[in-house]
């Protein structure tokens, strides 16, 4: 309440304060969606029950801060964080860990929390006011798997997908060498690796993005009609050795190893498209993680 004895100076200051509160900038700030609200909206739209035990949690930053933009990525490397910050995006949604372990726990580092690389990354996050949230488990849990949808679309294999098994495909016949070249071109991979006869004819294959594990990978190779497994990454003394032995035994089997990031990257590009269908208050952009590997020309 303003008294009739209030001085003109105080009235002016009050008027200025009200004008400031009603200014477009302040009004826009007050209506801007927070990081927590973004996640709550995702939980409501993802279409699968939310797990109590999950890695899909905030990894850094204050969930209550207003979001200026959302950067969606496969992996929140420092390079990705720098590009997100430079473009004015303060919420980073990442599929893979930010701090070097599946649980984002630095206990595996010899220096733990005192590790210099970890400290520099955390300092950058804090200095630029970034919020990092992981979206891994529930994006995979969707039916069909969100990562798989994006990868199949990027490879142009939608029409070849087995209706009974989303990970199996019947493609027009191609040699292993030609198919590997085509995949490398479509996914822009410079360091793809192949196991098997380059001239082997391929028609039936399985796609296993990321690191699905020895049991899943050999399960695919054990299927009598599967000639090729396209996968993200694996231990060489597990699936690679298994495939090599199968080939030596005379079985027509092959591997194309994409690398973890390129094997799922298009799945997070698909996630970006999906997020845009129900988040329109702020920009939502895909920030691809760069593949750090390169190979010398022999």
Report the location of each language-model feature.
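Bacterial N-terminal signal peptides
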Residues: 12-23
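Hydrophobic structural segments
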Residues: 2, 8, 18, 27-298
């Amino acid at each position: 309440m303003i008294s009739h004895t209030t001085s003109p100076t105080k009235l002016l200051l009050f008027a200025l304060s009200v004008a400031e509160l009603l200014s477009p900038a302040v009004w826009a700030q007050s209506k801007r969606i927070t990081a927590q609200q973004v996640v709550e909206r995702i939980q409501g739209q993802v279409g699968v029950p939310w797990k109590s035990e999950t890695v899909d949690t905030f990894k850094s930053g204050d969930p209550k801060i207003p979001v200026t933009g959302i950067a969606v990525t496969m992996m929140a490397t420092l390079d990705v964080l720098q590009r997100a910050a430079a473009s004015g995006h303060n919420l980073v949604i990442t599929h893979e860990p930010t701090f070097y372990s599946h649980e984002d726990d630095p206990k595996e580092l010899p220096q733990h929390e005192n590790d210099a690389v970890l400290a520099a990354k955390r300092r950058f996050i804090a200095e630029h006011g970034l919020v990092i949230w992981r979206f891994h488990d529930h994006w995979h849990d969707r039916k069909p798997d969100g990562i798989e949808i994006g990868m199949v679309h990027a490879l142009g294999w939608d029409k070849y997908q087995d209706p009974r098994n989303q990970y199996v495909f019947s493609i027009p016949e191609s040699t292993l060498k030609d198919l590997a070249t085509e995949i490398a071109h479509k996914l822009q991979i410079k360091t793809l690796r192949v196991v098997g006869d380059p001239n082997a004819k391929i028609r039936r294959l399985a796609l296993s993005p990321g690191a699905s594990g020895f049991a899943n990978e050999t399960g695919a190779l054990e299927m009598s009609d599967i000639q090729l497994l396209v996968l993200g990454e694996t231990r060489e003394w597990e699936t690679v050795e298994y495939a090599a032995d199968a080939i030596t035994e005379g079985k027509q089997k092959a591997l194309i190893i994409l690398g973890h990031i390129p094997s799922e990257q298009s799945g997070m590009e698909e996630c970006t498209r999906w997020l845009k269908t129900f988040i329109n208050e702020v920009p939502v952009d895909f920030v691809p993680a760069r593949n750090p590997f390169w190979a010398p020309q022999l």
